[in-house]
Structures are given as structure tokens and as C-alpha cells.
Design a protein with these regions (language model features):
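Short helix-loop boundary/capping segments
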Residues: 117-130, 135-138
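Eukaryotic intrinsically disordered, low-complexity regulatory linkers and tails enriched in Ser/Thr/Pro
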Residues: 9-16, 22, 42-45
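Repeated scaffold domains used in trafficking and secretory/extracellular systems
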Residues: 17-38, 83-107, 137-152, 186-216
Length: 216
């Protein structure tokens, strides 16, 4: 069963339940962000092609398509909308191209987001028409990258594992090439850690509200 609850002030020990819907095999969100307009919450989600995949049957649990879960909190109803491209084909997902733990922003009717894996998409939350935009490698043997987004593009903070030099890149949603904004080694001493702490990892970062310097 899928449930939407309200975590603000409530009466008693149990938060109010806003919506309930039956669990659908193979449907997962894996998100901590969503589009919200009025009483309607919309969340890009993953629908597995093989919900019963296991090592025993040889089916791949990572193969599936993108859908939108749309929750109308005024009625408590959920609608599942397949996400399709301009030709009407499904937006396919797999181990190499994911939407898991995305950072997203709504611009008009379009929800733009990039997954923790570095795959960027845009989806019209009204029609369900979507498009794959680009990918930015998020992790390799010698670096790791975390993302933030603005209305104009993606900010990627890369931590180089060997010397812990940190670089901020920017790439517009419209597909222009990625460009470097700045590089610093000032965090190196902290990230390398100590005998007590071990090495540190950058889990996330924030953009100053209203700042969109990469677009300038």
C-alpha cells in the first residue's frame, strides 16, 4: 500500500493520512523531491518491467520505464501516467540510466531533474511527454560528483579522489557543453580526514537562493 501523510502539526500520535492507494508491483519512487501545484503532487517514478525479477529467474530488476505518480490530495486519488517521448515511445530506464534520488525543479509545466547517477530528464507534468537530456558521470575510481539544479541548468560539484581538488561545473538543460566555474584545493585537508575520522565525502551542497551564476 502507498500512503501520503502530513508531517506538520497534527492531533494525537498519528499524522493525518492525505491519500492511500494500492501498492503496484514493481513501482518505486526512490525520491525525496517532487513537483507540487496546489493540491496535486507529481513524482517521476520507476515501473519495473519484471517485478518478480530475481537471481533465480535471470530477469533484470533494473529494467523498466518512467511513469508519473500524480496524487490529488483534495480527493486522495492517485493516477499513474506513462512518460513517453515525442514519438510516443516509453522512456526506458536501466542500470546505466536511472532516475533514482534526483534533484529537480519545475519550470512552467516541465519538471527538470538529474538523478544521483547523473542522468538528466525533462517531463511535462500535464501531458506526460518526456525527454532524456544528457548524462554527467557521477562516480568513477578517481572522482565522485553531486548535483544541484536551477531553472536554467545543472550544477555538478566534482571531488577528485586522489588529491581532493573540488571543481564546480555548470551545464544548461538545453544541451550546451558543460563548463567549469571554479576549482579549489581549500577543502582538501578536511576531506582527507584524520586517523580518527577517515576520509570525508561530499554528500550534497547548496546554491545561494537567487544565484544562478552558471547561466551568466
Amino acid at each position: 500500500m502507498a500512503v501520503v501523510v502530513q508531517l506538520t502539526d497534527h492531533d494525537g500520535d498519528v499524522p493525518p493520512v492525505l491519500a492511500v492507494a494500492p501498492m503496484i508491483d514493481g513501482l518505486t519512487s526512490g525520491q525525496n523531491m517532487f513537483s507540487c501545484e496546489g493540491d496535486v503532487v507529481t513524482m517521476p517514478s520507476f515501473q519495473a518491467t519484471y517485478p518478480n525479477a530475481s537471481r533465480d529467474n535471470g530477469l533484470d530488476a533494473n529494467v523498466g520505464t518512467m511513469v508519473l505518480q500524480r496524487w490529488d490530495l483534495s480527493t486522495g486519488q492517485r493516477t499513474i501516467i506513462p512518460v513517453v517521448d515525442a514519438e510516443g515511445g516509453a522512456i526506458e530506464l536501466n542500470e546505466e540510466r536511472t532516475i533514482h534520488l534526483y534533484e529537480g525543479i519545475q519550470v512552467g509545466n516541465e519538471y527538470r531533474f538529474i538523478s544521483a547517477n547523473g542522468d538528466a530528464f525533462a517531463v511535462d507534468v500535464t501531458s506526460g511527454q518526456g525527454r532524456y537530456l544528457f548524462s554527467i558521470p557521477s562516480r568513477s575510481r578517481d572522482h565522485s560528483t553531486v548535483f544541484q539544479v536551477s531553472a536554467t541548468g545543472v550544477y555538478a560539484l566534482e571531488d577528485r579522489g586522489d588529491d581532493r581538488v573540488v571543481t564546480l561545473f555548470y551545464r544548461p538543460w538545453d544541451g550546451e557543453e558543460q563548463r567549469e566555474l571554479f576549482t579549489t584545493s581549500d577543502l582538501g585537508r578536511y576531506l582527507k580526514g584524520t586517523a580518527l575520522t577517515g576520509q570525508m565525502d561530499i554528500q550534497s551542497f547548496a546554491l545561494r537562493p537567487g544565484w544562478d551564476g552558471g547561466a551568466q
